[in-house]
Amino acid sequence: MALICCVLCFVARPRLWPSSSAAFPLGTPALSMIALMLGTYALRGLHELCHWLAARAAGVRASIRVSHRLYLLVFETDLTGLLALPRRRRYWPLLIGMGFDTVVLALVLVLRLGAQAGFWHPAPSLANVLAAITLLQVVGIGMQFFVFMRTDVYAVLATAAGCTSLWSVTLLTLRCRLGFASPGHRAALQEAHPRDRAVARWYVWLYAAGMLLAAWFFAAYFAPATVRVVWWWLSR
């Protein structure tokens, strides 16, 4: 229902779709970046808490830790305990984080839609914050589909494919394809589950393409934007 609500809101009011200006809800770029970073980690923390609660409700152990996705610092829930469950019981704990994100996005969109329709009149600062949350949630949900990283959608696809160690087997496969594999790496790949090896044969190309895309994004956008914000801060 939340997903349908989001789609209907965007269709009814295309202006609700986040623009680049939503990344600056406060008076200055530096303060806006700090606010976005804090907001991101707060929402991601709640996202991971949902994973943890769902895993505990399913009767398996789970833990939340700080990790990274490429050059991004993230929260991560260890859900390896789900492998002890039947496959059909693993999906809900894997998908509940995106469910939380969608519910938050739907609530924010309804508030913004109500404001545009004149049902309430938020202060400009609050309207900017709601637009920024929309941006964070759209980006957050979109990034879950980056299956070349260990995202929720990656975990769902790996589960649906019957894999248990796809990530490590993919890295071993890439080493072998590039000629960087040691005898130990080749032996580990041969000992891996046949299903993981079969899926890794095509997933490795998706992973490699994703890494190239991520490297381009870092060089073209992430690093220059970070340098500009730091330079602006130091020059004040």
Where is each model-derived feature located?
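Membrane-embedded catalytic scaffold of the fatty acid hydroxylase/desaturase
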Residues: 31-188
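Topogenic membrane-insertion module of multi-pass membrane proteins
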Residues: 1-42
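Hydrophobic core of alpha-helical transmembrane segments in multi-pass integral membrane proteins
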Residues: 2-11, 110, 210-219
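C-terminal membrane-associated helical module and adjoining short loops/tails
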Residues: 146-236
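Membrane-interfacial helical/loop segments at transmembrane boundaries in membrane proteins
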Residues: 16-23, 120, 227-236
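Select subsegments of transmembrane alpha-helices in polytopic membrane proteins
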Residues: 1-4, 92-103, 203-214
